[in-house]
Amino acid sequence: GFNVIDNYTYCFLGDGCLMEGISHEVCSLAGTWKLNKLIVIYDDNGISIDGKVINWFSDNTRERFESYGWNVIGPVDGHDIDEMDRAIATAKQSQDKPTLIIARTVIGKGSPNRQGTSKVHGEALGEEELKLTREALGWKWDPFVIPQEIYDAMNAREKGEKLEAEYNEMWARYGQEYPQLCKELSRRLKGDLPEDFEAVMQQAIEKAAVAQETVATRKASQKALNAFASHLPELLGGSADLTGSNLTNWTGVEAMRPDTYLGRHINYGVREFGMSAIQNGIALYHGFVPFSATFLTFSDYSRNAIRMAALMKQRSIFVFTHDSIGLGEDGPTHQSVEHIPSLRLIPNLNVWRPCDTVEALVAWQSAIESRHTPSIIIGSRQNIEFIARDPQEVVRDAKEALKAGAYVMKESGKGADGVDCVLIATGSEVPLAVKAREALEEKGIGTRVVSMPCTELFDKLSSEEKRAILTDAPKVAIEASVTGLWYKYVKNGEVVGIDKFGESAPAGVLWEKFGFTVDRVVEAAMKAINH
């Protein structure tokens, strides 16, 4: 056979890492999945920044990992290269378990006055201690000088070149014997999309533009998945125990299980942070387009992983549903108000809040095509009315949304040159903006409605392009979230939003209570106009 992908994955961690909650989430899951090619080396030095960890970390690490279903080796001497080499060789023999190698070490080993203390953890040794350390280690060479014998012993270039040549020769033979498989694997490892992907998405958008269905945008997201997932074999999704609510599964998809890794949907269990971090690892490995899902309010648990995806410029896709007070009786613990604007503050992250199936398709297309920018796709629990208009107009709007993150959904009754007011909305508030426009038009106020599903793409436009969409007319932004960020778009205009936590009540009652009504939007528009 051709072992074109046969690597082990190595992870190095310390005492502090094992104190973090995420270590339980992911290590428990790795044991359940029987990931035998995962080898974790634990630097067990007993020291963290505050001192000896025995005062705040007294777990029996061996028993902990054995309870997860891991193979545990050690403790071994982490300073003994031969002993470590034997431990790794033993770990590679595991057939059905990941392996933890407990490597006992002395932090700062060789420093006469600081080894084994927290001082060497977060501080430089200093010139005097460096001098003493060199003497203790018998190191006679100047700083930054590597003796030739050590350089030669550590230089793996010749060995690496030989192994790479052997691998390239095997890859060439693989390509000759299995040309289609080789071509497909090469495409996926490069991160390129299938040649027909754009056409598939365009066809799905055109179909949705005709159907004009009124659905919850979590359902719209699932419809998008059903449209393209079979054409994107590298798509690998999952949910943190909310598959039936997030709607991350698609027709015909199989779940990944410990007895088969062929499934393309992962049941992560209630592990939001672990799920999001695993997804980043999958993205870094290449060959897959990973996405994960939970409720929007639980994005707080995933925030560090989201930030890291943005920092590392990875194509990670995060689906967050149940996005506002619109979810109703679950109350303020589950009703997001601050999450959307706070996620928009993360650099190099596209946050999509679509209002219908067409915008959901656009959001997915953008997320999948954004190779170096992670994306968030936000969905509602409740149905959102599709704003009826000519299908060709809808398709045109979709192209504009994909490029600009915003578009004119409804023009002023006085035409583009007669805009007296602009209503900007996202997601479930777009139909409210359209209804408010009708009321304003009856008052003789030419009102344009702009749907802005992705503010980040809009922010990248030139001043002229932004003005073409928003004009210089007074503006009102409408979104069921904290209002602050919207003032950069409305300037001295108005924002209809929520600057306090929600309450437990039916969604209809909450919309009325928090001022998401036509009368409130009209009032805000009149105030903006009369500033």
Which stretches of residues belong to each language-model region?
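Short acidic, Gly/Ser-rich segments with clustered Asp/Glu that frequently serve as metal-coordination loops
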Residues: G16-I22
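Non-catalytic, alpha-helical, charged scaffold/linker segments
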Residues: G138-W139, P143-E166
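Small/polar loops that bind or transfer phosphate-bearing groups
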Residues: G14, V76, S239, A293-T294, ...
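Thiamine diphosphate
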Residues: G1-Y8, Y10, S23-V145, N155-I378, N383-E385, A468-I469, ...
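Flexible, glycine/proline-enriched loop segments at strand-loop-helix junctions
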Residues: G14-G16, I73-V76, S118-K119, N348-R353
